[in-house]
């Protein structure tokens, strides 16, 4: 029952999944989504449904709904029907059709009333109103929707349509889904309207009651047409904003042909010497395609070719036609070519259709960002895909392949174009699949038979010629042996087809190399047929053989038809003969180059924008003015070019050869770019593009100053209803509560005030920049104000002042005032404030703007103080510095900064007020003395009067006491009575208390005083009455309490509560009494705590700082566990830096990677220890060595066992070869992806990589026994001679078999039972690593042209530039040669190679990267690298396989010659751009080249020398047009950057600001005759920094680094990784074994050979003679692949199933996969025999062919490496 229920449940789940993934459900879902795409058609639909009434209204509703549904149905049909989709999806459809229709509808119905159309039944047919409603809803439904864009849904449809099989069902279901959603939406709208009408509360609350309600409703209904017209107008405006206008859009100019043909005039001169076309090495190779297109248009009857989708063959076949017309005259041919080109341009412009003229699909209609590439000027378009889709036959069926070879498709298309009679008829898929399978079966059987016959012949010991399959040739006549030439035979491979020579890097190509190699490229004759250079002659030749085009079509189809038919007719022989006659070459297999210049490979044109754009900033900079078009196309930030200094004087210390340069400008200008202060709304937008379509820029304010992205909306100051933030309010309250400090409030207030001032200043600057003629007006006003101030206002004030002094009989101060007036300087500045001079105006100062800076401004003073007094006072009093400069405003005021607020000028009358205040103080001091005298006299007089009064008062008091002795009053009794009354709680009034207090007071003060008897009697009576009342009240209360029902328990509660209240009352009184002392104690403790905390702040901060720095350093050391951090310090540092240095030095001792140490080194150190007892190490060694027994050699284990350190016992190994072995062959076949560690580090995380290294990296000498076994196992087999065919082979044949045998050994290793580490040919690993490291063949973009290192090591930098090399340059003005003399000095200071403890050992490899060395003295550029080590340079402790790099390579560049003179010749025409693409060409080797190939070591020194010279030459020439070197430091820095290309130099940020400030002062000081005063004042103000003033003319690179001026930073290069690399590295994780990172003794010599032989990767392979024979070698390689694929196409299924845990695929195999038994290793001899006999069905190198042939992987869904079939691993008994 349970099984049945689970079965039902599983079926239900699967059924639900099928329903969800079905086409119908997906279509319904998509259709329901399209309901929310609301467009203008809904306006008409709602209008018809809401407003129209009556019979006509019903008809309109029906017509509107019908048109709406019909329009949507057309949209869905357009998904399936391609022509309709293209018509509706064009970008110009809406512009041409939708906008005029919208505008017509708006203006036509705008003046009409909604209900007054005047329609009757008679004119119904004439007006066609119902039909118009239908058309409106139909047409508007076809327009793009704007509330929810339909582009997203269209992409979903396209994706699903590509995957869907039943496309019509999908379209139908999506339409039904839309219809359901539309009905639901309309019903919802109707329900909402009905609810609004029926709900009285909404109408009563929202609308006005009484008669006004009806009036408003009628007005709303009458104005409904106007409302809809307004909505339509808004829609039109919206579309106008989103659609590019064809008329007003700026048309960008395409690149001119003269610019495309070459980079410079010199290159064009070189190219025109050979032909009227550009040379092969022109700068813009892709620009030649336009010439090709024009030529092809001419040949193909001017048919239009799409430049983005068409493949071309690069050729210049019109050169022959032109030269024939002009009898070979080259000059006339040039003229003729240009004439033809001009004619073609005019004709092409006329023939362009209207759509392409109005709508340029290559124009930047959308605001895309222009990404400029220095190598390829034109930007690549985004439409380029990395995949190529085409239909192909796979598994006998037509399928769409995303990885179809594009060259095959192009070749087939070219044949169809060039030979119109050729067409292929499509056969039905069923017939083709059956035919395909039958053909494969037949081929397989034939190959089986042939293979068996050859094996039988092998058993019969026939000769090798009859056994082995011979090479297949493309033959015309077998009897005559007429073959296709070897160089063009497609069946041949290798050297017979010619060697593909990869040219030298383009940066080292010289002019002589170009002249020697132009015209040496051969032409592919088969391409020549397809190109049909002389098309008419080609057609006539075809007609000679047969005029029937149908026969030609039938016979030529044999090249491509999969059916096998024999060609026996005469026509077929004629066709083949014709082909061979055309293609046949001369006897020397060389092509005459008089007719053609060159033909390149077939290529796919990358779609690029046809414009070379530059920004406004590049135009302002003025660089490369000749090679850049005039008008800028990129709108950069608003800026202006300001010349701040013009150097007209020649300098002798600069290169003198610059005088002879024609391009040298004698007036060297220093230019600054001035940016506008306003917000950058352009953001490098391209002219002509639509700014409203821009992403990430939204304007939500009416007047928005700055551009913001919506992502930062929460960071921007918002409106009140957006800015209610509870969290922010709580923070503000807490901050104000905690920090009630007046000083901080003042600081914040001052900061806010300064921010407001800066904002206002920028707003004023924006206003001046925004208006058209504002700068002209402002500049003229400033100059006028300057003249008025200097020459009119100030002299007039001086005259008035001195004349008034003369009238007041005072001495005039003419000389002092005139001296101050002359000291004032009006310096003309640029708009940014760069000072020029008093008389020199900046260029274009009227339009660009100007600033006038007043130095030492003149202020009128009423009098001048004496010099001695003022100077002495200034020395004694150090007041704050006063700014002795200001900027002039338009209104003649003074301001501190340009466009700042006017500052208050010192008043003329201020000294008067100061003097008046001083005199008033003097008068006050004198008057105070008089007042003090009178005050003292008043005090004495008052004291005497007081004493007399007191004496009289005492006398009177004594007399009264005597009189009142006889009549005393009993005050104490009264006091007692009233104290008793106070205890009563039921007293009603407070009068007795008051009287008692009054009596008490009197009795206390006047004890002896006598009262009248009447008053005493009254008091006694009152007391008695009150006492009686109290007694009466108490009696009444007792009666009440006795008569009540209260329990004694409640009375006790009341009494207890009273007691508690009394206790609380006492406590309160006590607290009130003691609160003062408590508060005082708290304040004292708080102040004490604050003082202690303030005293502990330095200790806590220093402790926290050291802890944080320690954590940062620990983190950096952990991240770089494989490297040793070399952190260098400056000398004479502060104490803080020295403490950090100690911390680093302590940490560096523990930062080495233990995995990188060798076993020999570790155990050698252990053996040197003077310790006899290893008890402490025994546990560690037993655990580590026993746990990692696979990675410790047997010799070391035996050594420890003999010495009794521990007893080691072999454990059972647990590695699973069943998962590893199927991948080994594939990994070894892709050895080129075994990249260096620095590239591998980019694919995995650092922590994960460290774990893998700790588990898998092995020590250097781990497998000597296994290595010896691997070395000799095939030599042992050679002696056995198990196969008799071995003896039949000749020595030459054995040599040929050796190549395949080296590759075959990897396949057989997978069958070996011995569990061993992953092994690869060591030459391949080392050669791949070293050659890619030092020839630039890495996979990092744009670095391939440099011959650089993998990283920059700090110890090498001072070796090249600081200590050991001095670069000196001399200039020869006549020959224009630069001699750079490089002299190696202090070579004995090279760091020691041998280490302590290892000095007696001889080893080729040494610790050249400074392991176990503590470096503390090397300079560091900036301390920020200390705290952020991730930005530090690559460290130098065993970074990239240091055990592979020998001493010879380390000292390769500078150890051969100590004095090396490089002569670099500068030629005008020798510059070759670095962005030229590589191309392939065929050639035949000469004897000299063959000799160099045989002995590459002979050619190596010359090659190295040429590379170095040409490399430096190209780098210097590349910068020749941009800048000229003026000092040795520039040459040194450029040389540094060229050698270490993956690093860049930058200077400090603060230094940049200081240098700019210094430049501004320099510009003024240079123009002054006596600059001392200005210089001193600028230094005092802090405008000019003395620390960056360079006293030396040529600072070395080391000094710049030490001063912190230059900082080295590594470049973050982008990596291009292909799919195979990632797959290789992913699979290789499980196969990282010790042998991958080790070098045995047998391979040391081969490592040296692989290092020196840089051109060939695998010249010296292993010297083992693998002369074993396998049956597979009988067949040729091509037939071998075919045989494997045919055998594996139908594998027999067996019962054994193997689950691959790595990819989770169920695989059917032919038997047990790699049985894991340790007893299989007993009989290794028989296993080796079996290994040589067995051979795999196919190799992994044929994986691509197998995928397309059988595994059906063209769509990429069924790709799996584990489908590979393996033979059974048999068990051999001894």
UniProtKB/Swiss-Prot annotation:
GO annotation, cellular component aspect: chloroplast inner membrane
Bias-annotated ranges (Basic and acidic residues): 254-268
Species the sequence originates in: Aethionema cordifolium (Lebanon stonecress)
PANTHER family: PROTEIN TIC 214, PROTEIN TIC 214-RELATED
Oligomer status and interactors: Part of the Tic complex.
Membrane topology: Multi-pass membrane protein
One Pfam assignment: Ycf1
Keywords: Chloroplast, Membrane, Plastid, Plastid inner membrane, Protein transport, Transmembrane, Transmembrane helix, Transport
Major localisation: plastid
Start and end residues of each stretch annotated as Disordered: 254-275
GO biological process: protein transport
Protein name: Protein TIC 214
Domain of life: Eukaryota
């Amino acid at each position: 029952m349970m099984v049945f229920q689970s079965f039902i449940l599983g079926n239900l789940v699967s059924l639900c999944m099928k329903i969800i993934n079905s086409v119908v459900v997906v279509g319904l879902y998509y259709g329901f989504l399209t309901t929310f795409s609301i467009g203008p058609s809904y306006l008409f639909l709602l209008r018809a449904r809401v407003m129209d009434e009556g019979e006509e209204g019903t008809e309109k509703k029906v017509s509107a709904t019908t048109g709406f549904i019909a329009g949507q149905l057309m949209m869905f049909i357009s998904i399936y029907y391609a022509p309709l989709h293209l018509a509706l999806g064009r970008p110009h459809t809406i512009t041409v059709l939708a906008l005029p229709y919208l505008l017509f509808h708006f203006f036509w119905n705008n003046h009409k009333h909604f209900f007054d159309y005047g329609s009757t039944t008679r004119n119904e047919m004439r007006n066609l109103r119902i039909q118009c409603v239908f058309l409106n809803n139909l047409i508007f439904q076809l327009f793009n929707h704007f509330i929810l864009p339909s582009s997203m849904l269209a992409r979903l449809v396209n994706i699903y349509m590509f995957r869907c099989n039943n496309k019509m069902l999908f379209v139908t279901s999506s339409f039904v889904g839309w219809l359901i959603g539309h009905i639901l939406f309309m019903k919802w709208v109707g329900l909402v309207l009905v609810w609004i009408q029926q709900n009285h509360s909404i109408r009563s609350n929202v609308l006005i009651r009484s008669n006004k309600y009806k009036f408003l409703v009628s007005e709303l209904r009458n104005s409904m047409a106007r409302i809809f017209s307004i909505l339509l107008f808004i829609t039109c405006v919206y579309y106008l904003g989103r659609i590019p206008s064809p008329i007003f859009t700026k048309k960008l100019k395409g690149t001119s042909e003269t610019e495309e043909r070459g980079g410079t005039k010199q290159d064009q001169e070189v190219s025109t010497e050979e032909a009227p076309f550009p040379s092969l090495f022109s700068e813009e190779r892709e620009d030649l395609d336009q010439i090709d297109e024009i030529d092809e248009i001419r040949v193909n009857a001017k048919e239009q070719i799409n430049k983005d989708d068409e493949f071309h063959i690069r050729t210049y076949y019109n050169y022959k036609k032109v030269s024939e017309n002009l009898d070979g005259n080259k000059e006339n041919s040039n003229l003729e070519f240009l004439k033809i080109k001009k004619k073609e341009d005019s004709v092409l412009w006329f023939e362009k259709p209207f759509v392409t003229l109005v709508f340029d699909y290559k124009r930047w209609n959308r605001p895309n960002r222009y990404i400029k590439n220095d190598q390829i000027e034109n930007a690549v378009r985004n439409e380029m895909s990395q995949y190529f889709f085409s239909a192909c036959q796979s598994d006998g069926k037509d399928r769409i392949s995303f990885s179809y070879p594009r060259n095959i498709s192009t070749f087939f298309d070219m044949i169809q174009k060039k030979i119109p009679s050729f067409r292929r008829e499509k056969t039905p898929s069923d017939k083709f699949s059956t035919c395909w399978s039958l053909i494969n079966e037949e081929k397989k059987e034939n190959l089986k038979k042939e293979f068996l016959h050859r094996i039988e012949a092998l058993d019969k010991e026939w000769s090798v010629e009859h056994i082995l399959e011979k090479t297949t040739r493309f033959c015309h006549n077998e009897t005559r042996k007429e073959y296709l030439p070897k160089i063009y035979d497609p069946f041949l491979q290798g050297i017979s087809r010619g060697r593909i020579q990869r040219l030298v890097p383009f940066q080292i190509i010289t002019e002589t190399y170009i002249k020697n190699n132009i015209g040496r490229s051969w032409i592919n004759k088969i391409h020549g047929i397809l190109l049909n250079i002389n098309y008419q002659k080609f057609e006539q030749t075809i007609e000679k053989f047969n005029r029937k085009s149908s026969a030609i079509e039938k016979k030529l189809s044999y090249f491509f038809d999969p059916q096998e038919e024999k060609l026996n007719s005469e026509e077929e022989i004629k066709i083949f003969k014709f082909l061979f006659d055309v293609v046949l070459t001369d006897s020397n297999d060389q092509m005459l180059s008089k007719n053609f210049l060159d033909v390149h490979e077939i290529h796919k044109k990358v779609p690029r924008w046809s414009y070379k754009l530059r920004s406004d900033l590049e135009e302002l900079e003025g660089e490369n003015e000749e090679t850049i078009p005039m008008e800028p196309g990129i709108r950069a930030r608003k800026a202006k070019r300001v010349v701040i200094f013009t150097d007209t004087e020649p300098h002798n210390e600069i290169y003198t050869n610059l005088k002879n340069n024609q391009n040298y400008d004698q007036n060297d200008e220093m230019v600054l770019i001035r940016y506008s202060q306003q917000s950058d709304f352009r953001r490098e937008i391209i002219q002509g593009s639509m700014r409203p379509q821009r992403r990430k820029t939204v304007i939500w304010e009416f007047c928005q100053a700055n551009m913001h992205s919506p992502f930062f909306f929460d960071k921007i100051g918002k409106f009140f209803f957006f800015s209610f933030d509870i969290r922010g309010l709580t923070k503000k309250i807490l901050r104000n509560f905690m920090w009630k400090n007046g000083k901080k409030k003042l600081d914040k207030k001052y900061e806010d005030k300064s921010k407001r001032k800066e904002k206002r200043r920028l707003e004023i600057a924006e206003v001046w920049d925004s208006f058209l003629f504002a700068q002209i007006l402002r500049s003229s006003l400033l100059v006028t104000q300057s003249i008025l101030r200097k020459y009119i206002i100030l002299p007039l004030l001086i005259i008035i002042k001195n004349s008034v002094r003369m009238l007041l009989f005072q001495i005039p101060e003419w000389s002092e005032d005139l001296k101050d007036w002359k000291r004032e300087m009006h310096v003309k500045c640029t708009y940014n404030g760069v000072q020029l001079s008093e008389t020199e105006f900046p260029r274009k100062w009227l339009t660009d703007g100007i600033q006038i800076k007043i130095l030492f401004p003149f202020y009128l003073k009423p009098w001048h103080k004496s010099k001695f007094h003022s100077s002495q006072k200034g020395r004694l009093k150090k007041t704050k510095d006063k700014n002795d400069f200001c900027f002039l405003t338009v209104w003649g005021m003074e301001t501190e900064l340009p466009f700042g607020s006017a500052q208050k000028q010192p008043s003329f009358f201020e000294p008067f007020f100061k003097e008046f205040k001083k005199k008033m103080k003097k008068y006050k001091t004198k008057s105070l003395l008089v007042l003090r005298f009178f005050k003292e006299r008043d005090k004495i007089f008052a004291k005497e009067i007081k004493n007399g009064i007191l004496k009289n008062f005492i006398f009177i008091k004594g007399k009264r006491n005597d009189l009142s002795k006889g009549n005393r009053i009993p005050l104490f009794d009264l006091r007692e009575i009233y104290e008793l009354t106070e205890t009563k709680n039921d007293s009603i009034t407070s009068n007795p208390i008051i009287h008692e207090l009054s009596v008490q007071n009197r009795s206390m003060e006047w004890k002896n005083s006598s009262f009248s008897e009447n008053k005493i009697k009254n008091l006694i009576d009152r007391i008695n009455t009150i006492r009686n009342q109290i007694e009466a009240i108490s009696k009444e209360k007792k009666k009440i309490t006795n008569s009540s029902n209260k329990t004694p328990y409640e009375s006790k509660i009341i009494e207890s509560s009273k007691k508690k209240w009394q206790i609380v009352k006492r406590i309160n009184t006590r607290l009130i009494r003691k609160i003062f002392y408590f508060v005082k104690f708290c304040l004292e403790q708080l102040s004490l705590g604050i003082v202690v905390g303030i005293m502990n702040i330095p200790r806590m901060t220093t402790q926290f700082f050291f802890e944080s720095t320690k954590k940062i350093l620990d983190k950096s050391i952990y991240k770089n566990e494989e490297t040793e951090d070399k952190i260098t310090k400056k000398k004479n540092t502060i104490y803080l830096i020295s403490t950090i240095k100690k911390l680093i030095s302590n940490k560096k001792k523990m930062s080495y990677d233990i995995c990188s140490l060798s076993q020999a080194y570790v155990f050698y150190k252990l053996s040197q220890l003077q310790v006899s007892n290893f008890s402490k190490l025994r546990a560690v060694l037993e655990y580590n060595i026993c746990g990692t027994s696979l990675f410790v050699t047997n010799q070391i284990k035996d050594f420890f066992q003999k010495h009794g350190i521990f007893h080691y016992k072999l454990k059972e190994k647990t590695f699973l070869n069943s998962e590893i072995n199927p991948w080994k062959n594939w990994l070894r076949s892709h050895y080129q992806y075994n990249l260096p560690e620095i590239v591998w580090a980019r694919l995995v995380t650092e922590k994960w990589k460290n774990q893998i290294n700790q588990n898998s990296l092995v020590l250097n000498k781990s497998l000597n026994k296994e290595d010896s076994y691997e070395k000799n196992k095939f030599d042992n087999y050679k002696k056995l001679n198990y196969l008799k065919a071995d003896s039949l082979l000749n020595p030459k044949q054995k040599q040929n078999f050796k190549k395949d045998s080296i590759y075959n050994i990897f396949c057989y290793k997978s069958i070996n039972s011995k569990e061993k580490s992953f092994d690869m040919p060591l030459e391949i690993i080392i050669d791949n690593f070293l050659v890619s490291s030092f020839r630039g063949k890495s996979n990092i973009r744009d670095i391939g042209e440099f011959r650089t290192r993998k990283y920059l090591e700090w110890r090498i930098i001072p070796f090249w530039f600081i200590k050991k090399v001095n670069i000196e340059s001399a200039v020869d003005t006549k020959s224009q040669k630069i001699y750079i003399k490089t002299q190696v000095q202090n070579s004995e200071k090279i760091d020691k190679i041998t280490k302590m403890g290892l000095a007696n050992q001889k080893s080729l490899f040494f610790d050249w990267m400074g392991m176990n060395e503590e470096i503390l003295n090397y300079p560091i550029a900036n301390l920020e690298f200390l705290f952020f080590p991730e930005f530090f340079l690559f460290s130098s402790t065993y970074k990239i396989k240091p055990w592979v790099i020998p001493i010879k390579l380390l000292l390769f560049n500078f150890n051969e010659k100590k004095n090396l003179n490089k002569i670099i010749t500068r030629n005008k025409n020798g510059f070759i751009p670095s962005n030229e693409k590589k191309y392939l060409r065929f050639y035949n080797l000469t004897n000299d080249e063959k000799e160099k190939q045989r002995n590459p070591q002979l050619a190596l020194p010359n090659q190295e020398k040429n590379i170095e010279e040409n490399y430096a030459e190209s780098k210097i020439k590349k910068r020749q047009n941009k800048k000229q070197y003026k000092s040795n430091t520039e040459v040194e820095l450029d040389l540094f950057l060229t050698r270490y290309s993956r690093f860049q130099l930058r200077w400090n940020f603060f230094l940049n600001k200081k240098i700019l400030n210094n430049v501004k002062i320099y510009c003024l000081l240079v123009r002054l005759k006596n600059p001392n005063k200005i210089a001193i004042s600028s230094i005092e103000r802090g405008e000019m920094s003395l620390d960056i003033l360079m006293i030396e003319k040529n600072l070395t690179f080391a000094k710049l680094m030490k001063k912190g001026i230059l900082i080295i930073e590594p470049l973050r290069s982008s990596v291009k990784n292909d799919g195979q690399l990632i797959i290789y590295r992913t699979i290789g994780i499980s196969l990282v074994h010790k042998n991958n990172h080790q070098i045995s003794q047998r391979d040391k010599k081969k490592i040296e050979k692989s290092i020196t032989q840089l051109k060939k990767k695998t010249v010296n392979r292993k010297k083992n003679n693998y002369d074993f024979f396998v049956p597979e070698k009988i067949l040729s390689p091509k037939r071998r692949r075919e045989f494997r694929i045919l055998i594996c196409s139908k594998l027999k299924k067996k019962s054994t199933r193997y689950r691959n845990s790595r990819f989770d695929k169920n695989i059917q195999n032919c038997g047990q996969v790699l049985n894991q038994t340790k007893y299989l290793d007993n009989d290794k001899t028989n296993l080796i025999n079996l290994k040589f006999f067995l051979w795999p069905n196919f190799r992994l190198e044929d994986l691509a062919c197998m995928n397309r042939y059988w595994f059906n992987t063209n769509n990429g869904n069924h790709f799996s490496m584990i489908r590979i079939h393996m033979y059974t691993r048999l068990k051999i008994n001894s």
